[in-house]
């Protein structure tokens, strides 16, 4: 047996096929993160959504209270004073026509793209490049705004966008495996609360189907969703 497959087998053997309480699950997540890099902590949440209907789609943003653990590179499409404001607020890139042309040529050295409303006609042509990567600015995600300073500060602090995919599953990173269990729990609570708060109007009956967490290279660990609702973590 190779070293890699032996490692994976040993890690998987630590996980039982049952719903875990949050603190035990997060300790297991950290314990099973054995890759040679700092792994992300991921949540995969299956919801009872039929996303072909507009009133059963979920797409929104939230700010993780303990941040993402990732340095976010932000690009801003704006002109004049707004471009200067963006750089002063911590944007890594800022420009208008020149930046749009660079993106058209394949320059995607950023994690988030913000645009001022007057730039929307200019970036419409970027849909085919940015859309599949989830980088296209939109008012709903807070990435089309005149207040570029606040937007940059929020994303740098840990604001992220998430959506339910075609199968009704939300895939979201809620920190890094070198975070404390308490910090991971606070971030995971924020995820759960955001999903409940933004429950689509068309959903009837049971909303949550399953709730799993894992590290980037680790096994899935099932969580007991009722514990989050009761806020009684032990």
From Swiss-Prot:
A Pfam family per the record: Ribosomal_L1
Location (main, coarse): plastid
Subcellular location: Plastid, Chloroplast
One CC-aspect GO term: large ribosomal subunit
Record NCBIfam families: rplA_bact
Quaternary structure annotation from Swiss-Prot or TrEMBL: Part of the 50S ribosomal subunit.
UniProt xrefs under CDD domains: Ribosomal_L1 (cd00403)
UniProt family annotation: Belongs to the universal ribosomal protein uL1 family.
Role, per record: Binds directly to 23S rRNA. Might be involved in E site tRNA release (Potential).
InterPro entries, per the entry: Ribosom_uL1_bac-type, Ribosomal_uL1, Ribosomal_uL1-like, Ribosomal_uL1/biogenesis, Ribosomal_uL1_3-a/b-sand, Ribosomal_uL1_CS
Listed name of the protein: Large ribosomal subunit protein uL1c
Encoding gene, per UniProt annotation: rpl1
Keyword annotations of the record: Chloroplast, Plastid, Ribonucleoprotein, Ribosomal protein, RNA-binding, rRNA-binding
Transmembrane segments: none
One example GO MF annotation: rRNA binding
UniProt organism field: Guillardia theta (Cryptophyte)
An individual GO BP term: translation
PANTHER family assigned to the protein according to its UniProt record, in alphabetical order: 54S RIBOSOMAL PROTEIN L1, MITOCHONDRIAL, LARGE RIBOSOMAL SUBUNIT PROTEIN UL1M
Origin superkingdom: Eukaryota
